[in-house]
Amino acid sequence: MIYVGIDIAKLNHFASAISSDGEELIKPFKFTNDNDGFQLLISKLDPLDKDSLIIGLESTAHYGDNLVRYLVAKNYKVCVLNPIKTSTMRKNNIRKTKTDKVDTYIICKTLMVQESLRFVTFYDLDLMDLKALGRFRQKTIKQRTRLKIQLTSYVDEIFPELQYFFKSGLHQKSVYALLKEAPTPEAIASMHMTHLAHLLKVNSHGRFDKEMAQQLRVLAQKSVGASDSSLSIQITHTIQQIELLDSQLERVEAEMTEIMKFNDSVIMTIPGIGYINGGMILGEIGDIHRFSSPNKLLAYAGLDPSVYQSGNFQAKKTRMSKRGSKVLRYTFVNAAHNVVKNNATFKAYYDAKMTEGWTHYNALGHCAGKLVRIIWKMMTDNLEFNLD
């Protein structure tokens, strides 16, 4: 076998290759993190037997992602190593030097001593996409939530009576359409009744009729809100930002849905798990074989119980540790909530925890833990959901 070690950095990478006998086949060389650099790497590898090549690199941030995709697309065997493994090899090295060139040899030697290697597949690349999309989705939702809070505060100042008029709240299409065109009570009060009624009816799919439009105009005429032009500008701009984020979320979720449909994961057989929750779970877990037991997956998600013990005392009720992936933990709890609503066994388990005196969120945490164990088994053995 021929082992290729690549030390990853932001702008430039280093690579070298040695045979299974330890013979240096490619001396350490630098190549850029772009198409020219990737082609230089391939030109160095071309003289070697491709079927004998195993390429290894450390899992470090996102700087190596494009290179991994490039190599997998060209059908090279690529292994992403845990930095802990290369660190152990580095400590065992007689020379404690750490340079980019030395690190390429360390990666090669780490590949050589592994009992088994798992190579990156196209499915793994899809998981990388799901993880990136899922995290971007979470970040976008947080941004949108902050904007909605800001918008509520602006409307409270300029038209405080409005949020009580719309029973479903301010954050709906019909209210946004109204406020973009007439962000102040004065503007609403001066609108022609036919136009106001039409605007509300069209954007609420017929839920708001002419009578509601009349009531709204009377409310606007009597409003005690502040007449502030700066607030009206902030309202219209904030709504535009929210709508932009809404459109971005639609695109992200559509892409996640396409990836999930293509891969047809067994976790989609769980009642209550949709393409988005399922995609976020798969993306955050990655390779399920990284976790030798469901307990390790629980710990990775931070859903394992924290233990409090002092002398002969041990707490009977403990909280989840919350030390793992925050995104994965949130997704599991959210997914558990949906599964409880769609599966009798999970509903009974949830009810039992509530009967024991746990709060709603504590009970959901227990359900999430149960869901983790089931998903670990399903993904490990490729089994469809069946609690019967």
Model-derived segments and spans:
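A detector of single, family-specific signature residues
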Residues: 1-388
